[in-house]
């Protein structure tokens, strides 16, 4: 039972959110109101989770939107009687924390913990129904010991390996990036630096072992946004095709392999294109060609962020087409990627847009091998023909539909040994090595005798050294820490060195959702029974920018750990909501390209640059310090209260759409809550006194109350929070118009129902008005109301009246009227008499509730 020591003063009509919210947050904490219920056999569970934040030090409005959405869903499910797990933690490792700590000359650990403390206090201001007893940070030793444990589990399963590889190197952050962390312009997703290529020995996870399952199981994710599934589908990039082996004429034992999905065009190949680093290049002896290739390498390096020109360098190498033994020149081309397929592609200019452009530019032959219609005569092509059709100039395959020829040519190649059916993926193994201090150490020892040796699980954790040297704008790498790096080999016992790379931070976030159900377990990363009971996450909320990073890695981890028999689930997240960005007005001078702070603008209704008086363009863009359009959540809460901030965030736009910040809209929600406050203050003064009741008013209120219950329940269930608040407003209008003219039982029932419906959206004021109308326990311990279908039935309906099938009138008919009464009422109406008077009525057909047809 919750009975606060201090009740809010009810002798004022002024709504004071700061006092109300502070009071109730304290009560919730004291009473441990949001502690997760233990699951029983009869429990109906709901696991609600927001993507956990990186502790940057301050909440921004994007955070607020994410956590308020999840909190609303968690509260709603709790009202519906479910055992709810709604935890929070911190994604605490990574370069931003290390760089920020270096700037301040302090340890990343100190910096991170300070930020966590501040952000936690900010989150609590929002009134989130979080079970804080389950909180952890990924930089805690008692968390990353289990990240290391799971690394070793994956190692034992053959999913971890080390190899020398050309990697993406960030020259600003001095670390390796996974392919997914390099944007379309070739820049680091963190620092924005142009990414370089570097050869290093690195640790990888075999995510490609699960490529097919990751792709196929997207079909199971019915409650994921389609665009996220498409992004993952494209990233995995399954291609079903054929590897074709071309002999090299100067060396019959040497072959070049090309992957293609179009073996039907093999007779149209007029050149092969290879990448700048293809192994065949070492067979080129002409110095001029070698220099041209070096120049091309430099061009590609310098223009990673620009649209590349399709440059080609003809070599002296000649391949032999296996289908007709024709010689084919080999070119080095700027558009061929080392990392995709075999680093070589066949050029079919007649039937590929890119190849056509390349051939025209470099005077390469164009050979037409597919026509649209069998009767069509061949002619010189003005553009590539890329549709289906029939083969020509293809020996014994002439006249065959190209879709059939694909299979036949491929089959002939397989039978004759120059082709192999192949499934290929764009997805590459996950590179997890990072060359920085602030990350989870890799539990491997490097021994001169035994090589790379995994530690025994009993030797975990490999803790980060605390005696770090912060100087020269960097934290010395783990390899420079003599006291830390030196150890003994767990296999042979001789002197050895610890692995000095740390893990990609996505290693920590790929399993954190598995830790919450048993976050205090000290003997293993999680209890199998708890995972099988609580997982998958029923509702996951976070940004779409994580579609091909965190979300893909988390799915991989789940499947890999399932195969290690650590639990039985296949997918981690049942339902995914990707919220839109929070945007705010930014003022841009298009002449200078600079953004101007609103505080420097005299008149925001007609904004001009205070320096050159140029008219400023007003743009709604993602909140950012550089654009001077950030809104501090704490200042909004201080001025209007957390409930107002929550209501605005939930009302302004559907959750998956971008939200435009508007002060007037925030004030509108504050006024709405103030009106609710005044109504309940007024009602509380005579809550038990009998007032005169009016049946029509009672009927109206009962109906609006049941409509609200039905619509708000459906809207929250479908993540339509903005329309749910619209229904709340309609119910409030009916409540305020009718509450003083209904019987006392209905009055209390309606006030009680409105309070419960409001509670997931505005949890603090709901607690206070719940007390005002005489209830002692927390409103958040109540059950969600059910609507009464009978109350939604209309007293009357509109009857359409036809004469000989043509509409002549409409009339409101009481539901209780029978057919004789309906006939008597309608046949007297002037609009009907006009068409029936002095005529014989042969038949009257009535479809009750809809239509009446008079046949004359």
From Swiss-Prot:
Principal EC category: ligase
UniProtKB keywords: Aminoacyl-tRNA synthetase, ATP-binding, Cytoplasm, Ligase, Nucleotide-binding, Protein biosynthesis
GO terms of biological process kind: leucyl-tRNA aminoacylation
Cross-referenced Gene3D superfamilies: HUPs, Isoleucyl-tRNA Synthetase, Domain 1
Pfam families in alphabetical order: Anticodon_1 (PF08264), tRNA-synt_1 (PF00133), tRNA-synt_1_2 (PF13603), tRNA-synt_1g (PF09334)
UniProt cross-references to CDD domains, sorted A to Z: Anticodon_Ia_Leu_BEm, LeuRS_core
Coiled coil: none
EC number: 6.1.1.4
Record motif 'KMSKS' region, residues: 622-626
Keyword Hydrolase: no
Location(s) in or outside the cell: Cytoplasm
Catalyses which reaction(s): tRNA(Leu) + L-leucine + ATP = L-leucyl-tRNA(Leu) + AMP + diphosphate
GO molecular function, one term: aminoacyl-tRNA deacylase activity
InterPro entries assigned to the protein according to its UniProt record, in alphabetical order: aa-tRNA-synth_I_CS, aa-tRNA-synth_Ia, Leu-tRNA-ligase, Leu_tRNA-synth_edit, M/V/L/I-tRNA-synth_anticd-bd, Methionyl/Leucyl_tRNA_Synth, Rossmann-like_a/b/a_fold, tRNAsynth_Ia_anticodon-bd
Motif ('HIGH' region): 53-63
CC per GO annotation: cytosol
Family membership: Belongs to the class-I aminoacyl-tRNA synthetase family.
PANTHER family the UniProt entry points to: LEUCINE--TRNA LIGASE, MITOCHONDRIAL, LEUCYL-TRNA SYNTHETASE
This protein's name: Leucine--tRNA ligase
Organism expressing this protein natively: Prochlorococcus marinus (strain MIT 9312)
Gene: leuS
